[in-house]
Amino acid sequence: MFKRKIEIHHEEVFEGLGAARQYAEEAQKSKMRYKAFLERLKSLDIKGRYLDVGAGSGVVAGTIAQHYPDVQLTALELSADMAAVGKEHLKDKGVQDQINFVVGDAADEELVHSLGKFDLIYSTYALHHWKNPRKVIDTLMTRLTDKGLLFLHDLRRVWWLYWIPSQSGFFKSIRGAYIRAEVQDILKGLNPEYYEIKNEFPFLLSIIIRKQTI
């Protein structure tokens, strides 16, 4: 068995703007990791208001803003330093007026409720970091419009990477990532009207949750 292992990532602790900027630069260089997410997002063809949960330095939000100028985004990020760097990044791209950065925790129900309703709520590579994913997903579902959609894109735990004895952030994330059956167990307690969980090649997990069946 290769049980889920929760390990602290050194990269998750951003001590100051310098560390946040370094992380942001690395994220910019590895845009290919978001390719599958952006392709699926395009196929969903959702207009209106988006909420990016765990927005980091705004790489994904900025890319979406450039491709979909009519979409209004709220970027929720736990780290104040990362959010500050994100604002710089968005200004450089010229999309700062399209995106509102908010510092806070997705597990904070009061904060999330204060953000309003969204046509799409998404997260990229954040699910495996949430201490209480059921609570976060439940809270996010309440912020969807009647036909809104929650899209979670993350790594998937696979045996052929799990056993590699590396302490890099990527391999720690692989060991801490969920598999399809575990996500199903999380969602069972929430009773969404519709959901789909897909294993994506080579080690990704795509989760779509609809508040209302269309």
Model segments located where?
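Conserved class I S-adenosyl-L-methionine
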Residues: 1-45
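Class I SAM-dependent methyltransferase SAM/SAH-binding core
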Residues: 51, 59-108
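Conserved glycine-rich SAM-binding loop
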Residues: 56
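Short conserved loop adjoining the S-adenosyl-L-methionine
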Residues: 108-115
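A conserved beta-strand element that flanks and buttresses the S-adenosyl-L-methionine
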Residues: 122
